[in-house]
Amino acid sequence: MCFLDIFTYICSIIYYLYIVYMNKNIISLKDFEITPNENVTERSQNFQSYIDQMEQFGCKSYWVMGKTGVGAKMQIEGYNGEVSAYISNDYLGMSQRAETKEAGINAVLKYGTGASAAQAIGGYLDIHQQLEQGIAKFVGQEDAILFSSGFGANAGLLRAILGKNDIAYIDSYIHTSATSGLIGTNVKHIGHNDIDYLDMILERETGKYQTRLVIIDGVYSQNGDLSKLPEYIAVCKKHDCLLMMDDAHGIGVMGENGRGTADYYNCLGQVDIITGTFSKSFGCVGGFVAASKKTDSVSKILC
């Protein structure tokens, strides 16, 4: 993309904003913040009008079609040649490595395109077990269980292990996948990385719940900062409380050996539950829960 392309793009945005300011009938993203008098069909139609309107000004932001595999450089619709891409979570470029592609091809040739059954009733393959053992060892845990996505790992685990007599203490910045699993249990929101408040509330609520679980991210996806993992570990041990860390954005990136946030803080083996995904640094698809053998045995039965 040359300077003229960039200049033209900026001018189109400025012109669009001017039109929005002058013409109150033009739809903007603000119109979708609160729409109390519209049903879902009306909202979706209006949003599509907004997308179409943006495209008229050369600002297509949704459903941009790629013509090559996602990487640092890729080809997309509307442009000749390659563009620099900042949209991917494939941090290490694993999805485009020849070894990764070859392994995928060999697995399909041997096993087909899917197990076509739940793991508990016949869809559990030897390569699943190998992957579970490998990822558990990699993140410093005893055992692991696989899921079809990182989102499913968080939501599925939490729905399985927490009930009405339990509670989750959650950092205010944790991922939506974790909050979506907190149905049918008690939840308390803790300020972001607020160790002192967590310490106080755990002390105050000692003996009130059967299972107490603190949920944090290793690397927070929306602002990129780290959890205060060593302090969380200390507080949870002090109050006999379980600690769960979603390390989707830390594994493969953080730590001397890329083993995640626990590796970065030299805390491998000290976090009760670690969840993650294969769709980021591993450049593939799927998710996992890694924990003690006792915890994962419960997860395999209930999930």
Indicate residue ranges for each PLM-predicted region.
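N-terminal "arm"/small-domain region of PLP-dependent enzymes with the aminotransferase-like
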Residues: 5-34, 43-111, 241
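Active-site phosphate-binding strand-loop segment of PLP-dependent enzymes
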Residues: 90, 192-245
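Conserved PLP-anchoring active-site segment centered on the Schiff-base-forming lysine
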Residues: 157-176
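Active-site-proximal loop->helix
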Residues: 176-186
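Active-site PLP attachment segment
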Residues: 263-298
